[in-house]
């Protein structure tokens, strides 16, 4: 039986660092919100079977997304943290039968709206049949420094360092088990939760264009990337 690929987009955050008057996933770039650009990536990809967006129960912007993408599931069961939001989304996928434990869940940041389709294809092809799952990532290019107050305390050896991106692809059952802990402190992405089970996910070559909209100045770069598509 074919294993499904389900995109899960946690979009319950408020994006405080971005400094807008609304969550950054609802900031408009061009004629669409950031979240709409992100959803479109998965809806256009032939290997993705379903897209699910998990928002906050108090979300007042999601109706526009549902109108733009009536086939996408928009669930208002987000948690206080990203990990809780993903956990709630995966649990509902399993409870409703929309996902089997062996199906692939591709968790993707709502604010990464420039993911190239070829990077998504590469992740599915290389990690889609891997029991340990895998993530998009790129080797660290810059020299990294440790800080002590306002001074450099050490230079970090970067040879084996990779910068994690999304999507992060794992079987639904594995992801559900990895996020089942009552205390999810320190879990900043899905791979870190899976690693706590003693599993070593694959690193799949990502793409520098797959940046995360975090600071206000990032919007300029994102706009250029979207215009180039």
From Swiss-Prot:
Q: Output one GO MF annotation.
A: 2-C-methyl-D-erythritol 4-phosphate cytidylyltransferase activity
Q: Does the keyword Transcription regulation apply?
A: no
Does Transferase count among this protein's keywords? yes
Q: Which PROSITE patterns match?
A: ISPD (PS01295)
Quote the NCBIfam families the UniProt record gives.
ispD (TIGR00453)
Site description Positions MEP for the nucleophilic attack, residues in chain: 158, 212
Family designation? Belongs to the IspD/TarI cytidylyltransferase family. IspD subfamily.
The scientific name of the source species is Neisseria meningitidis serogroup A / serotype 4A (strain DSM 15465 / Z2491)
Tell me which residues are marked as the site Transition state stabilizer.
Answer: 17, 24
- Cite the EC number: 2.7.7.60
The UniProt keyword set, sorted, is: Isoprene biosynthesis, Nucleotidyltransferase, Transferase
Name recorded for this polypeptide:
2-C-methyl-D-erythritol 4-phosphate cytidylyltransferase
Q: What does this protein do?
A: Catalyzes the formation of 4-diphosphocytidyl-2-C-methyl-D-erythritol from CTP and 2-C-methyl-D-erythritol 4-phosphate (MEP).
Q: Which CDD domains match?
A: CDP-ME_synthetase (cd02516)
Which reaction(s) does its UniProt entry say it catalyses?
2-C-methyl-D-erythritol 4-phosphate + CTP + H(+) = 4-CDP-2-C-methyl-D-erythritol + diphosphate
Which pathway, metabolic or otherwise, does it act in? Isoprenoid biosynthesis; isopentenyl diphosphate biosynthesis via DXP pathway; isopentenyl diphosphate from 1-deoxy-D-xylulose 5-phosphate: step 2/6
Which InterPro entries does the UniProt record give?
A: IspD, IspD/TarI, IspD/TarI_cytidylyltransf_bact, ISPD_synthase_CS, Nucleotide-diphossugar_trans
Pfam families assigned:
IspD
Which biological processes are named by the entry's GO terms?
A: isopentenyl diphosphate biosynthetic process, methylerythritol 4-phosphate pathway
């Amino acid at each position: 039986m074919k294993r499904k690929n389900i995109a899960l987009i946690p979009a319950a955050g408020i994006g405080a660092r971005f400094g807008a008057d609304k969550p950054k996933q609802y900031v408009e770039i061009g004629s669409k919100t950031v979240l709409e650009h992100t959803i479109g990536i998965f809806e256009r990809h032939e290997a993705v079977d379903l897209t699910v967006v998990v928002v906050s129960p108090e979300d007042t912007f999601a109706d526009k997304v549902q109108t733009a993408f009536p086939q996408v599931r928009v669930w208002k069961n987000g948690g206080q943290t990203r990990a809780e939001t993903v956990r709630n989304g995966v649990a509902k996928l399993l409870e409703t039968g929309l996902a089997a434990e062996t199906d692939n869940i591709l968790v993707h940041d709502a604010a990464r709206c420039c993911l190239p389709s070829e990077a998504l294809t590469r992740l599915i092809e290389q990690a889609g049949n891997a029991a340990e799952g895998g993530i998009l990532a790129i080797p660290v290019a810059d020299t990294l420094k440790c800080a002590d107050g306002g001074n450099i305390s050490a230079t970090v050896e970067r040879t084996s360092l990779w910068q994690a991106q999304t999507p992060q692809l794992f079987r639904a059952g594995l992801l559900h088990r990895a996020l089942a802990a009552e205390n999810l402190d320190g879990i900043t992405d899905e791979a870190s939760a899976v690693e706590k089970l003693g599993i070593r996910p694959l690193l799949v070559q990502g793409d520098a264009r797959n940046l995360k909209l975090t600071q206000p100045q990032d919007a300029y770069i994102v706009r250029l990337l979207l215009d180039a598509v």
